[in-house]
Amino acid sequence: MQKKELFRRVLQHFESTMDSTETELHFSNPFELAVAVVLSAQCTDKRINQVTPALFRDFPTPEALAATTPEVIYEYIKSVSYPNNKASHLVGMGKMLMEQYGGEVPSTLEELIRLPGVGRKTANVIQAVAFGKAALAVDTHVYRVSHRLGLVPKSCTTPYAVEKALCKYIPEHLIGPSHYWLLLHGRYTCTARKPHCEICAFAEFCPSEVLGRSKT
């Protein structure tokens, strides 16, 4: 199957079966999204959604975060992965937002990756979800699904390479949603271990299914 046709079929299925939501994280503004995404690194969205209500209630603004300490934030997020590091990142992020961005979350990649705890993946999520930009975050799910479906060549061995390869074929208006679609497919269907190929809409043309690699 030609690459363009493969992308067309995959994206057509996602568009017709998935809603327009772009994250399972709960948030009400760009600041809350930034906090939630920083916390979500190597942790489940379900867990993050359990700790953020109290965190957002008591620290609703960058100013509030900047005025507290990592030790205080730790008590709110101690059930997530790497709570000490993330507590420091959040307080540092609050301070930088106040000191350099007027208390507002910036919208460009260059500015976002300057924030403590924010790398390219996190920045792309914020750009796409909070600001509607054509940015595609590549996490482990997106990376795995992209390779298994043959959307990207084997030579794409880094998240950045996968991001660039995907964006060559995904229409600009679907780049943001595609991150979430691929993520959900990897999270619930094309899982790392024992993928559910029997219910996968792409099984008939998935090279991993045909060659049996997806069952390893």
Please place each PLM-identified region on the residue numbering.
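Catalytic cores of DNA base-excision repair glycosylases
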Residues: 2-215
